[in-house]
Amino acid sequence: MRGCGVDRTGGYVRLALAAPAVRVADCAYNTQRMIQTVRRAASCGVDILLFPRLSLTGCSCASLFAQDTLLSAVCTHVSALCAGTADCQLLALVSVPCFLRTQVRVCTALVARGRVLALVVQDTLAACGAQKMQVPCEVLYGGAPVPVYDVQTCFESAEGLFSFCVGAMDGSVPATLVLQAYGTPSTAQTPDIFAAHAAAYSAQHQCAYAYVNAGWGESSADAVYGAESGIFECGQCVVQDSLQEMRERGERPAHAVRGLHVSADVDVSLVHFRRRARSGHTTLGASAPCVTLPAGIFAASKAHATLRRPRVPCPFFPPAFQKSQDAVPPLTGAVCLAVSAPSDTQDGFLQRTIDLAAQGVALRLEHMGCRRLVVGVSGGVDSACALLICARALDFLSIARTQLYALTLPGFGTTSGTKGAAQEFARALGCTVQEISISAAVTHHLHDIGHTMQQCDGTYENAQARERTQILLDRANQLDALMIGTGDASEGALGWETFGGDHLSLYAVNASLPKTVVRALISYAGRVPERFVCETDSPYAPRGAAFSRVCAAIVAQPVSPELIPPCDDRIVQCTEEMLGPYELHDFFLYHITVNGFGPRKLFRVAAHAFGXAYSCAQLCAALRVFFTRLFSQQFKRSCVPDGPGLTEVNLSPRVGFYFPSDTSGALWRAELEQLACGE
């Protein structure tokens, strides 16, 4: 198979699944419904349209499949379908019974631009024997010669941007899209079975997998068909639907007569990236011939203005968090998924995250022979998260939480609100709380190097961060303890940390957790205080509601390093005012490291995911900050302490996303400039 061509589509292929209502053995009626569906799909810019198994006749014709009358009608109406859609720029995959080489076989006709490009033999109808057919070959179909292939054949677009196969392939899968038409009787478990198979197959083979089952109108003599359909991408669901889900959305049964239609934009460039990044993945197989289709078939000659994909502004959260806010629409609608899941689903994910991190800390304590931990707490979400994890780690080892030393280290920018929140949070967990001011030591140090206290610059700020780290490390030495770092993945990606200061620790427990996840963890702790509040009779340890209030206060506090003196005890140094929203930077971080997106594609998917929340100018500004700091601050990530990998993003130079510290970012900056100019 040839390599990827020049991508002018943004890397997306618009795929539609359609299960229009059928009448069993009524080819004329079914053909008209299919023509309507094809024309509607073409008007929406669909590139590939997949129909269910034997959709032109209905899959429940049984012994009638062997009748000359039905087979002749199929051939006639395939020609009618071609004629009725000749001006449509898409590829329709239509499953039909064909009499080939003495057998009635289930074939998929590739219909485009008014003709049948090929027939793909799926299998032989059980009632008619099982004699194997030698392919490839050529047959006369509808009065024209048509090549015939088997399911192990891969078809590629003329531009080489994507490829597909009809039905699951054996062994390695060279195709980027696997298209499966079903005619399977439905049970209550069928949607879950189809979805589980699609998720597993697409994850194993790093491909996109789409399926559609027969639906309304099939014979109900012995079974019913639910039109289950779905598109999965490298293990993740892009969209799912069925007649049952239509009913659950409140659509009247009469709506089912018009059939089910689902469409989405499949990110084939993501599939290509995942395969390149996946060590040992084979995309070529000796038993998988590749056929290049003629040019001009697909509508994907330019990028669509609007993406038909789930809106996922927080990609670090698992698929279980994704729940559609609206009914999955017909071809003319828009697919919109948002982070909104049942609380038990969210809580399970968040609790597992905390417990895995705590396991890492517990194992490191055992390895070092330590029984104490030291954490610097500031009243922000990062240090609160680290403290929460450390408390859990001591529980795992049956060590009293009093062996967890929470040090508040107030300096020139510390406010009473953040210091009070830090101390209250630590006491609720049962920690030993200690306060050590850094003001005198930093003042003396700045005087020694000839730096005035009025000059609140980088030296002024970094001196405080390094003093805090020195105190924490020295206190850990005193206590024979492990000093835990609190910096998160968002700060690591942006280099928003002091080299030799908060950049250093003995174990960086938050290193793979972005700010959005850290905030969610503290909010979760506030929702279930009984899981974390220390069981003690101490009058200083707040219970339940008080702990929840302090968690809420910590989450609501603006992110700040608190290194500049406050105004009337209010924070004046807000990180997100300087860098841009962390939710944007976390979004960029995920997609550049996990999916390999560049600036142009990041801009497009961010605009889609966040809707009207940010203007184009705001997105461009945040992208410029992100890429500038990603490259300029790599030297800090080249020497980081150990820390557990808890998400898909890991910035460790040992096992994660890494590039040399002196790498040029000129290519990415140039693409950003083109983006800013509207090119």
Curated annotation (Swiss-Prot):
Superkingdom of this protein's organism: Bacteria
Main EC class the enzyme belongs to: ligase
Catalysis performed (reactions): deamido-NAD(+) + L-glutamine + ATP + H2O = L-glutamate + AMP + diphosphate + NAD(+) + H(+)
Listed name of the protein: Putative glutamine-dependent NAD(+) synthetase
Cross-referenced Pfam families: NAD_synthase
Residues binding deamido-NAD(+): 364, 462, 477, 491, 496-499, 636, 661
Gene: nadE
EC number in record: 6.3.5.1
Organism: Treponema pallidum (strain Nichols)
Entry keywords, A to Z: ATP-binding, Ligase, NAD, Nucleotide-binding
Record's function text: Catalyzes the ATP-dependent amidation of deamido-NAD to form NAD.
GO CC terms in record: cytoplasm
